[in-house]
Design a protein with these regions (language model features):
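Post-cleavage N-terminal segment of exported redox proteins
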Residues: 43-126, 141-149
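Short glycine/threonine-rich turn/loop motifs
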Residues: 1-37, 100-179
Length: 179
């Protein structure tokens, strides 16, 4: 908005259905429906009010019809907007990617893709750094490549972004972000 830049990258909206531990990098939203309307009101993201969004949607018969189909009423509220956005985001599911098919034995990787997977999942060996893995899989495991935890990767000693600490106030959460 007006050239403003946020201080974090957007998280993936894929496979939110299986998220079990907060939303946003710092976990400040407990439920997806809460997360869905926060960017609307953020001055750097959409810089809008829910009241204005409701008013705009009420002026478009396409939306009033869709709200009637979804909720049995054409009464548009910010809560119903959050529910609609939540359902939409829960529908964005990855289940037929090449990786998914590879895991199911229905696809093969190229040599380069195999090397990438080895690099991702193999442990780092400080005695052979040129030939060891990047050790990503310890934290980014499972089908969604997420542990659902908040961790500090330890790269910084001073933090420009306090991460989870700003939500919990716990010193142990300083610099921690959702994995």
């Amino acid at each position: 908005i007006d050239g403003s830049m946020g201080h974090r990258q957007a998280m993936s909206a894929v496979n939110m259905l299986w998220n079990t531990n907060g939303y946003f990098w710092d976990g400040r939203a407990e439920k997806l429906r809460e997360q869905s309307i926060m960017p609307i009101q953020d001055p750097i993201e959409m810089n809008e009010t829910l009241e204005n969004v409701v008013e705009k949607l009420e002026q478009d018969t396409l939306y009033t019809h869709q709200f009637f189909r979804a909720f049995g009423t054409d009464d548009i509220t910010s809560y119903r907007i959050s529910l609609a956005l939540e359902q939409f985001m829960n529908s964005i599911v990855s289940y037929r990617s090449k990786y998914d098919l590879y895991i199911e034995g229905e696809a093969t990787f190229t040599e380069e893709e195999e090397l990438g997977m080895e690099l991702f999942f193999e442990e780092y060996n400080p005695f052979f750094p040129q030939t060891s893995g990047a050790d990503c899989g310890h934290c980014h495991g499972g089908k969604n490549f997420s542990s659902q935890e908040y961790m500090n990767n330890g790269l910084d000693t001073l933090y420009d972004d306090n991460g989870r600490y700003d939500v919990t106030g716990l010193e142990s959460d300083r610099g921690a972000m959702k994995v």
